[in-house]
Amino acid sequence: MHDYEPDREDGLCSIRKMLKEAKGIGDFLGEMRDRTFKKYDAFSVGEVFDEKDEEIPDFIGDNGYFSSMFDFEETIWGASDKGWYDCKQITPDAYKKCCFTTQRKIGDIGFVSNIIENHDEPRGVSRYIPEGDCCDASKKMLGGLNFMLRGLPFIYQGQELGMENVKFESIDQVDDISSLDEYKVALEAGCTPEEALKAVSRFSRDNARTPMQWTDGENAGFTTGKPWLKVNANYTKINAESQMNDPESVRSFYKKLIALRKNPEYKETVVYGELEPVWEDVHNLMAYYRKGDKTLLVVGNYQKEPQTCLLYTSPSPRDPKT
């Protein structure tokens, strides 16, 4: 038993400190693997936090507990023990660093599962694209940068449409218990109701749980009844029906990414190839090579103004020359 020191003004301590010292988790996960997934050669992916670098082979190595594990490096960036109201908004440079940190850490141990969002996170385009720059072009850029990373790309419902965070007008429109708790924490810390709601709106997982935007009809075509969460007001502009036959839509771009990954001509490079970061010090730019039997260069410019970078040429994909 441990009696942990309080880490907040309410006299309580985050459970994460206890989790970091938990023992015997590997024994349980190994038994679960052997008695369930392994017997059927089933694919499994774990939500893993606080793992040590030397433990990664245990989780996703040749005989790992799971087939893969999600990359949460960018989702926990800027977190604060004080609460959401004190969390930092991630920048393009920080996002780039998080992605490359994971890529270097995992290496060829196994395949990490790359995400922009999921059911427990806000919408990725609202989180990782700078405020005021969220548009179809930037949504495609973010999707491409994430999808082309080494690993297994996961697409959460609505991500392929570029669905965005909802604008909550009142805390009464929020359902998630953690969001309601964080609203109280912000108020107790001295935030105004408006400031507390803004913090909750930015990070609430209810953003990813609003009704799927199928059409521009009633309740976004999700239901003829009353949905339990507010429908995002932008459903008339962002919905599946309007993007189905639009070759320039966000959805069409994701289809192209999927087709590229499945293309036998590029599979060896896109799926199994190495990842080599490039121009890491260039502000508002994320770029990397994928190297296999071919060499592909993936570049995303976060700013409206063009940038100039020195391009490498190489007679061999694995031996770049200036």
Feature names for model-found ranges:
Residues M1-L310, S314, R318:
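Active-site and adjacent substrate-binding regions of carbohydrate-active enzymes
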Residues P320-T322:
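N-terminal low-complexity segments that are often proline-rich with Ser/Thr-Pro
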